[in-house]
Regions:
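Acyl-donor (CoA/ACP) binding surface of acyl/acetyltransferases
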Residues: 1-33, 61-171
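An amphipathic alpha-helix signature
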Residues: 15-22, 40, 44-48, 55
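Conserved GNAT-fold acetyl-CoA-binding loop/helix
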Residues: 29-49, 60
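A short helix-loop-beta-strand connector motif used in the catalytic cores of GNAT acetyltransferases and
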Residues: 51-63
Length: 171
């Protein structure tokens, strides 16, 4: 299955994406808001989760490619992990290679993923969350017509320490 936009192709993540995922997750600027770069094993585990989520739930993060087949990153809706502070939910997220920033790709890809989540997957709500000091992601959330939902803001402990998430939700 492939989702297409005017400039992008979104496809299921696959084994062949391991090298590109590792490069994406190793970039310090890309990973600044996520506790820093991931090593290869951590990056591979993330890809494995996306592949497994698609097989189990029918939705997950999509690999993003330009029309020439160049890997730009990923975007899509994931089911929450069982122990998430917000309980069960579907969360949209994205991460792009550094040289893909500033071209509107995150908004374009996430918009296609949201449409798929509501139409094909029949989800009724999708949320997003980001750090308070990540205005780029907050701007994407606003362009996706998500609304701030401060009553659901949360804190969680991750490998990198305590993380405070600002929540946005679909209208």
């Amino acid at each position: 299955m492939i989702l297409e936009t005017p400039r992008l192709r979104l496809r299921r993540c696959q084994e062949a994406d391991r090298h590109a995922f590792a490069a994406l997750h190793a970039h310090p600027e890309v990973m600044r808001d996520y506790g820093g770069p991931l090593d290869r094993a951590q990056s591979d585990a993330k890809l494995d989760r996306y592949i497994a989520a698609f097989a189990r739930h029918g939705f997950a993060r999509w690999a993003i490619e330009d029309r020439g087949g160049v890997f730009l990153g990923y975007a899509g809706v994931m089911p929450s992990p069982p122990a998430h502070p917000l309980g069960p939910h579907a969360e949209i997220g994205w991460r792009l290679m550094r040289d893909a920033w500033g071209h509107g790709y995150a908004t374009e890809a996430a918009s296609a993923a949201l449409r798929d989540a509501f139409t094909r997957c029949r989800l009724t709500e999708v949320i997003a969350y980001t750090a308070a000091d990540n205005p780029r992601s907050q701007a994407v959330m606003a362009r996706l017509d998500l609304r701030r939902d401060p009553a659901r803001d949360f804190s969680a402990v991750y490998e990198s320490g305590i993380w405070h998430g600002l929540v946005w939700s679909t209208p």
